[in-house]
Curated annotation (Swiss-Prot):
It is found in: Secreted. InterPro entries: Cystine-knot_cytokine, TGF-b_C, TGF-b_propeptide, TGF-beta-rel. Belongs to the TGF-beta family. Disulfide bonds join C272-C282, C281-C340, C309-C372, C313-C374. Residues 1-23 form the signal peptide. GO terms for molecular function: cytokine activity; growth factor activity. Homodimer; disulfide-linked. The keyword Signal applies. It comes from the Eukaryota. This is Growth/differentiation factor 8. GO terms for cellular component: extracellular space. The keyword Membrane does not apply. Pfam families: TGF_beta (PF00019), TGFb_propeptide (PF00688).
């Protein structure tokens, strides 16, 4: 009799605890429950999406070894951005991201960005300032990323002003050296002869790989270079210090370094959209817009598809993770269960200004979620 009273008490308590709507007949409770479930799922995904965007901002700065986003305005960027063929190629033919499933993986990617191309603008050195008869250009400071990587290509780009009639231009690149008493101040690097036609000016590239490698071996020997480009009448056509209307025509160095390919790991996962009712772990679309952050220092891409993982990992779906399942069986209360996380990620290529106003083209690993799974 006492047991019966206990059962009745429990039953009454359950009736009181249940929402009154749930006791009515009809389809309305089911519809409300489904709507509530969808609403909760949308809220959860929205929170996950916001967290993912904030995490991406932190990861980009960390992987680029930047303590904070470079403070470069759009006006300054217009002045610094070279109007040169190699840079225009990177922007015009920009590969925002690779959808190839064999490209990179979370386990095999390094954490920090892999530099592929560095565009270095000229600066003034103390040696150039102290010289009598200031040379026409240029001193280049090199990033530590160049010093610790193998250089596969190094080109000096110079812009030659337009000519009014067909003419031959004599280009000479000289390397500055410390003079011994009355000795020479320069040694030749490259000399070439160009035939120019009337019209707009042209960009000319010159191979300086050997010189750069010597500078990297002996940094103290890097005192700068001088650029000369005279036509038949002795007019200097090289833009070394841009005048009015010559923004973006500075000489610059384009340096390419090796990039070690990464092995990938194949996996399978679910893909969903924002209207999906899928409750299992799934990959959802997410576009990151750098312009919305005010990150003008990122030249390209202005936005990219990052994606994110969301929803649940139930133990009933864990045949793929026997170790996790066994842990749960052994200690069901102590196990927090698996989480829906990226199981495969791929890099993005990025063209950006670093804190020293150098233009870097590199690969940032693990920035695009390719697949999601429970782990």
């Amino acid at each position: 009799m006492q047991k019966l009273a206990v059962y009745v008490y429990i039953y009454l308590f359950m009736l009181i605890s249940v929402d009154p709507v749930a006791l009515d007949d009809g389809s309305q409770p089911t519809e409300n429950a489904e709507k509530d479930g969808l609403c909760n799922a949308c809220t959860w995904r929205q929170n996950t999406k916001s967290s993912r965007i904030e995490a991406i901002k932190i990861q980009i700065l960390s992987k680029l070894r930047l303590e904070q986003a470079p403070n470069i305005s759009r006006d300054v960027i217009k002045q610094l951005l070279p109007k040169a063929p190699p840079l225009q190629e990177l922007i015009d033919q920009y590969d925002v991201q690779r959808d190839d499933s064999s490209d990179g993986s979370l386990e095999d990617d390094d954490y920090h960005a892999t530099t592929e191309t560095i565009i270095t603008m000229p600066t003034e050195s103390d040696f150039l300032v102290q010289m009598e008869g200031k040379p026409k250009c240029c001193f280049f400071k090199f990033s530590s990323k160049i010093q610790y990587n193998k250089v596969v290509k190094a080109q000096l780009w110079i812009y030659l002003r337009q000519v009014q009639k067909p003419t031959t231009v004599f280009v000479q690149i000289l390397r500055l050296i410390k003079p011994m008493k009355d000795g020479p101040r320069y040694t030749g690097i490259r000399s070439l002869k160009l035939d120019m036609n009337p019209g707009t000016g042209i960009w000319q590239s010159i191979d300086v790989k050997t010189v750069l490698q010597n500078w990297l071996k002996q940094p103290e020997s890097n005192l700068g270079i001088e650029i000369k480009a005279f036509d038949e009448n002795g007019r200097d056509l090289a833009v070394t210090f841009p005048g009015p209307g010559e923004d973006g025509l500075n000489p610059f160095l384009e340096v390419r370094v090796t990039d070690t390919p990464k092995r990938s790991r194949r996996d399978f996962g679910l893909d969903c959209d924002e209207h999906s009712t899928e409750s299992r772990c799934c990959r959802y679309p997410l576009t990151v817009d750098f312009e919305a952050f005010g990150w003008d220092w990122i030249i390209a891409p202005k936005r990219y598809k990052a994606n994110y993982c969301s929803e649940e990992c139930e133990f009933v779906f864990l045949q793929k993770y026997p170790h996790t399942h066994l842990v749960h069986q052994a200690n069901p209360r102590g196990s927090a269960g698996p989480c829906c996380t990226p199981t495969k990620m791929s890099p993005i290529n990025m063209l950006y200004f670093n804190g020293k106003e150098q233009i870097i083209y590199g690969k940032i690993p693990a920035m695009v979620v390719d697949r999601c799974g429970c782990s």
